[in-house]
């Protein structure tokens, strides 16, 4: 593990850019960027276009380590190049930004008010390649919709079981049990989730460290205990469907919680913008998310 990057993740000011839309969510991301589905004929063309979009974001002067500590990539992006370098190397070496890899394979069907992760095939192989590509950590997401204690325990058990394999491979896992912002029991879900996470954190050894990616809680500073826990490198927040402005306002109410937004970062970007307009729009988004994170 890169100790300099670990220190950067623990202490640097800023946020984590989530650039990890996968196959399922790519058409939506491209459409929001002004590239409709009829612009490409197959998946290969679609992934080429989304890599062009990500390259434009990552190479922009607005995308820098003064504001952005880390970036989460989709597996395809990790295997592609920017200006002749693998994306993770470009981020780390040219930009001073810590690269992460999304490793989950999507969500299982909802049962008992939660969605566990689908089985992650070839995890060992993916982690081996991530190490080769100088990736620092990983991210994987599950979703909680109802305050079912047994089901929430299952979600957290699954996250930490896989998280330990990731730690054993020398990477830092971002554990993301998202609470649905539309859940009528959101606050109760968050209380149950916090207790379950603390239980797992307390069982980790001194050299087992994780990051957490959580929905911004209804109760202000609910996650302070997690932020201060010695086994936690950093706690980041997902925007969860809130608009940028709403997410930023909610984030400001929670000390020590920083952003890891995707939609909020790219919502005002468009394929047809001139480089000047594109950079200005990205700079504005970066500044607003940074300000809410510090």
From Swiss-Prot:
Gene3D superfamilies: Aldolase class I (3.20.20.70)
Catalysis: reaction(s): beta-D-fructose 1,6-bisphosphate = D-glyceraldehyde 3-phosphate + dihydroxyacetone phosphate
A molecular-function term among this protein's GO annotations: fructose-bisphosphate aldolase activity
Active-site residues (renumbered): 176 (proton acceptor), 213 (schiff-base intermediate with dihydroxyacetone-p)
Pfam families: Glycolytic
EC number: 4.1.2.13
Family: Belongs to the class I fructose-bisphosphate aldolase family.
Protein name stated in the entry: Fructose-bisphosphate aldolase class 1
The encoding gene: fda
């Amino acid at each position: 593990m890169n100790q300099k990057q670990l220190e950067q993740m623990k202490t640097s000011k800023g946020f984590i850019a989530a650039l990890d839309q996968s196959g399922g969510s790519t058409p939506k991301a491209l459409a929001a960027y002004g590239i409709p589905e009829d612009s490409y004929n197959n998946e290969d063309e679609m992934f080429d276009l989304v890599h062009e979009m990500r390259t434009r974001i990552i190479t922009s002067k607005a995308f820098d380590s003064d504001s952005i500590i880390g970036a989460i990539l989709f597996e395809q992006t990790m295997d592609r190049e920017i200006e002749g370098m693998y994306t993770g190397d470009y981020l780390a070496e040219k930009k001073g930004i810590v690269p992460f890899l999304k490793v989950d394979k999507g969500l299982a069907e909802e049962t008992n008010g939660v969605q566990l992760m689908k089985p992650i095939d070839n995890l060992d192989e993916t982690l081996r390649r991530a190490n080769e590509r100088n990736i620092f950590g990983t991210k994987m997401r599950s979703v909680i919709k109802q305050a079912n204690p047994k089901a929430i325990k299952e979600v957290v058990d699954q996250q930490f079981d896989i998280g330990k394999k990731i730690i054993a491979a020398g990477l830092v896992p971002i554990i993301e049990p998202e609470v649905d912002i539309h859940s009528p029991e959101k606050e109760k879900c968050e209380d149950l989730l916090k207790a379950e996470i603390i239980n797992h954190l307390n069982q980790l050894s001194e050299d087992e460290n994780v990051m957490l990616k959580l929905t911004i809680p209804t109760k202000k500073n609910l996650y302070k205990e997690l932020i201060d826990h010695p086994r936690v490198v950093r706690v980041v927040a997902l925007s969860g469907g809130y608009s940028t402005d709403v997410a930023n306002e909610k984030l400001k109410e929670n000390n020590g919680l920083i952003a890891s937004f995707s939609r909020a970062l790219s919502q005002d970007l468009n394929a047809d913008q001139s480089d000047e307009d594109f950079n200005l729009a990205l700079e504005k988004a970066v500044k607003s998310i940074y300000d809410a994170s510090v």
